[in-house]
């Protein structure tokens, strides 16, 4: 089928504003937490809009919404595109929502311009990615890929004590045949997303082609020393866990800077007990988050970090407990899909560059099971998870155009 020149017929910015009404806050932010009324209203609105585009729509058993354009030659070979509908508390309008709406608009325009594809296309509005209501992330893509089961919904609870399973049932989901095995019909997944960083804005390029999504490890480090008087305890006799933690964090940041490929290290949470100005703390806890695109780098840094913490604490007479509570492996994006994305960008005259995603995305979960790729558009100031999150209309439209043409290349 001969490819025609496509334009964005429906304003992506209008759709961004439309979806942002569901869970809108007074300062321009959006809060759409899994299985709340705002979330349910948004998913139903998306499903209705997909149907108006002529797509076959359905909910799966956890609340993911699919809009299907069946293929004529290989209907069982499905190319899925989309992102997540949920937000962080008082987040922005674009994170996740942009990828959902772009997927819908791309399928609408392809259908109107070319009719049915050879391979099946599906737009998906994934129910959850952020982990903002329950202490579990990727509930939507994790179910689609068979990583999670209904058993996994029983324990996680929100701040009100409501379990994930209860909230799911109260929203009308989780009562049918639960997706217990991964889908075998998906041949590719494409996710369009805002960058949530400032690399593209600084380089002036239109698109980022993601090469891999960084692996993550998170730790809670507990240091126990000796609580004592701030005025009467000599510096040389102290067993101060806060002083030890300061030295540990400083040394880890220095070491992360020395690596040739950037390792991102964050210590974003720290508590001291009893947290009194004139008392040497007896106990300190702090978090460590490390991210890198190569598994061997993460593993080596982990080993070096454990040795450093134990070494400093041994010198100071402090007991250390290191609890690794999250481990997500790096996921490379599919080479064939990346090449097709680059080709599409060049054909349209869009400037682009390869990027590693330091943030986790649904493509990371899905990319473990199926070929996947991600496209980024610029984020102004690199701001995200905030009401100030913003991407210009031109940049949004470039992303939709690139996605539409890439799907044409893959499915028609």
From Swiss-Prot:
- Annotated Zn(2+) 1 binding sites: 84, 95, 193
Pathway field of the UniProt record reads:
Nitrogen metabolism; (S)-allantoin degradation
Cofactor dependence is on: Zn(2+)
Question: Could you say which EC number(s) this protein's record lists?
Answer: 3.5.3.9
Swiss-Prot/TrEMBL GO biological process terms? allantoin catabolic process; purine nucleobase metabolic process
What is the induction comment?
Answer: Transcriptionally regulated by PucR. Expression is very low in excess nitrogen (glutamate plus ammonia) and is induced during limiting-nitrogen conditions (glutamate). Expression is further induced when allantoin is added during limiting-nitrogen conditions.
Keywords, ordered alphabetically:
Cytoplasm, Hydrolase, Metal-binding, Purine metabolism, Zinc
The UniProt catalytic activity note for this protein reads: allantoate + H2O + 2 H(+) = (S)-2-ureidoglycine + NH4(+) + CO2
- List the Gene3D superfamilies: 3.30.70.360, Zn peptidases (3.40.630.10)
Question: Where does the chain bind Zn(2+) 2?
Answer: 95, 130, 385
NCBIfam families, alphabetized? hydantase, PRK09290.1-1, PRK09290.1-5
Q: Can you state the subunit structure given in the record?
A: Homodimer.
Its annotated function is as follows: Involved in the anaerobic nitrogen utilization via the assimilation of allantoin. Catalyzes specifically the hydrolysis of allantoate to yield CO2, NH3 and S-ureidoglycine, which is unstable and readily undergoes a second deamination by S-ureidoglycine aminohydrolase AllE to yield S-ureidoglycolate and NH3.
Q: What is this protein called?
A: Allantoate amidohydrolase
């Amino acid at each position: 089928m001969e490819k025609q020149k496509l334009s964005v017929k429906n304003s992506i910015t209008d759709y961004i504003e439309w979806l942002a009404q569901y869970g809108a806050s007074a300062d321009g932010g959006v809060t759409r937490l899994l299985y709340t009324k705002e979330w349910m209203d948004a998913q139903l609105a998306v499903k209705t809009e997909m149907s108006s585009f002529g797509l076959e729509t359905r909910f799966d058993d956890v609340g993911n919404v699919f809009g299907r354009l069946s293929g004529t030659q290989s209907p069982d070979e499905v190319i899925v595109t989309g992102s997540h509908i949920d937000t962080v508390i008082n987040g922005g309008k674009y994170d996740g929502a942009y990828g959902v709406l772009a997927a819908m608009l791309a399928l609408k325009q392809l259908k109107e311009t070319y009719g049915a594809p050879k391979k099946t296309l599906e737009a998906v509005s994934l129910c959850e990615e952020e982990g903002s209501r329950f202490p579990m992330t990727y509930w939507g893509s994790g179910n689609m890929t068979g990583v999670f089961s209904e058993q996994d919904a029983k324990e996680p609870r929100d701040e009100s004590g409501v379990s994930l399973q209860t909230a799911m049932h109260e929203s009308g989901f989780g009562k049918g045949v639960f997706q217990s095995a991964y889908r075998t019909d998906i041949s590719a997944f494409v996710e369009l997303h805002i960058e949530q960083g400032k690399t593209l804005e600084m380089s002036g390029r239109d698109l980022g082609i993601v090469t891999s999504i960084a692996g993550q490890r998170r730790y809670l480090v507990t240091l126990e020393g000796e609580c004592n008087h701030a005025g009467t305890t000599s510096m040389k006799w102290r067993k101060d866990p806060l002083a030890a933690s300061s030295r540990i964090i400083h040394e880890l940041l220095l070491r992360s800077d020395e690596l040739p490929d950037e390792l991102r290290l964050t210590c974003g949470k720290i508590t001291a007990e009893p947290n009194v100005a004139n008392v040497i703390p007896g106990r300190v806890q702090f978090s460590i988050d490390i991210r890198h695109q190569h598994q061997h780098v993460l593993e080596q840094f982990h080993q070096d970090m454990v040795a450093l913490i134990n070494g400093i604490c041994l010198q100071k007479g402090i007991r250390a407990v290191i609890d690794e509570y999250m481990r997500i492996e790096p996921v490379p994006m599919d080479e064939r899909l990346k090449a097709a994305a680059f080709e599409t960008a060049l054909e349209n005259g869009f400037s682009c560059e390869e990027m590693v995603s330091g943030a986790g995305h649904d493509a990371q979960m899905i990319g473990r099971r199926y070929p996947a790729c991600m496209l980024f558009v610029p984020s102004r100031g690199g701001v995200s998870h905030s009401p100030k999150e913003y991407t210009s209309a031109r940049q949004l439209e470039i992303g939709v155009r690139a996605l539409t043409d890439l799907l044409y290349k893959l499915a028609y």
